[in-house]
């Protein structure tokens, strides 16, 4: 039934109908306003047809009813119910616009009162509905070239590590960006993350570590973004962990596969994920925990998407139960009284942007908690999505709505005075920097912790 389009439409109607009646998620992402507006406009279309057919007179503005004598035009007012938009009134384009505008921030999951795990008969999972719709459409039409390109982050990282400075230079040439927009669907004005030739994996191979009696041992899941674009974050995470007596290893790994889920490429996702499952599960079996040092999307994928979209087994369950976001793991150490909190430097007041995919993991604000360990630190929560979501915000057709979401987040940040801005998500930081023309350039809680310890930028000691 999963792949049956009729079954999909039936479930789509059910979930859309619940959302229309609730509208609690009206301000979370462009998908919900598109749904609500389309249904409301469908009602307007029904009214216009009735007026054209002479079945009713020209509709009175709703506000005018309040000024009429009691009972007058009561029949006109009651007939408005007939012109209320319904899910079944949506056109095919309107139905699928809701799908396309969902960028899987998953903020609706903790907000919605009807999601699985909550005691309600509706059992509504909007993000999974959208993924199912994308998967069925992809199965029918095939995977678009730009979706295939944007999903293969490991390939992009390898090319970038070989020709980083040259590619970074080419990305600034206007005529080439126009060509990339036509060929790859990357918006010409999207500032792309810079590639680094000395990747995190190269650095780790030459990194010397000597912890004779570790308090714990972890596998570093570096993520494709940290490996190719944000090496400083990966290095800082390792140096902090080793400073606190944690043994770190970096075994063979590849992109978690999350970019393949966006267009519903389940085969690509499984092909990408299986080697990680085989490798990581073996280390978990040997007593290692998995610490993710990149965007929270990756820890969310290992924890929740692997169990949901791969055939569940002991290996996947072990990975899910033993995966930590880096800030989450440091708070775990702190609760075990194994985290050094003798910091040399203060960082002041922080505007902390809450990552959507950390919220989706429903584990609290661990990045904020890490920052608050540093003496005299005040943290302001910025609880709004940046609108990036990896490939979605890079695409030509979604760049503008992506930036509109980001601008709202920047406005929230600028309302609060702070010494620095932080986000657990490197991609969100990249987005906010562009949306603010460089005025907002978020750091990462781990980088700020690294500074607070007084570590050298190069050696960590």
Regions found by a protein language model. Name each.
Residues 1-18, 460-461:
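Generic start-of-chain signal for non-secretory N-termini
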Residues 120-461:
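Iron-sulfur cluster-binding electron-transfer modules in prokaryotic oxidoreductases
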Residues 11-32, 94-116, 156-160, 228, ...:
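Cysteine-centered iron-sulfur cluster-binding motifs in ferredoxin-type domains/subunits
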Residues 11, 91, 218:
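Residue-level marker of regulatory loop/turn positions in helix-turn-helix DNA-binding domains and
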Residues 5-7, 89-90, 247:
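Short helix-capping and inter-helix turn/linker motifs at the boundaries of alpha-helical repeat units
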Residues 1-2, 27-101, 115-146, 439-451:
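Non-heme iron-sulfur electron-transfer modules
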Residues 35-39, 110-116, 305-307, 456:
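Short regulatory "switch" loops immediately downstream of catalytic or recognition motifs
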